Amino acid sequence: LNKQVLKQIKSLKPGSLIRVDWHDASIGKSLSGGRTGIDVPVFSIGIFIGLLGENDKHIILGQNHFRYADGIFDIDYTAIPLVWGVNVKVIQVEYISREEAQQLLNSFLLGGRRTLPKRLKRQERLRNHHDRLD
């Protein structure tokens, strides 16, 4: 575990816009480069939602936040295993308000336990149809 990353994460406030440098998992063959091809550097930028996970802690970054009329969000997120983190850079503290950050966290924690109204299911069908056109 990178103790510097843990220290950086513990000082973050939910709602801050951050960049996380990390190394992704990789697949390869021993004849295709061996040890030099193992590290896959990645950086992700998003709104810090929290450090979550039952077994292993993950840095949760929200990228796209779809707000519905009832104040619940559907969130596109990246979950980066804490142990894969290399560096964290704060771009802007409290990029969104504390209240909105709390709404994002609450929506994230609701997960699949919430059913969306039929009108949103229709919207989802339209979005899926659009994806097939690409």
Where are the predicted features?
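Conserved RNA-binding domains used in RNP assembly and mRNA/RNA metabolism
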Residues: 2-134
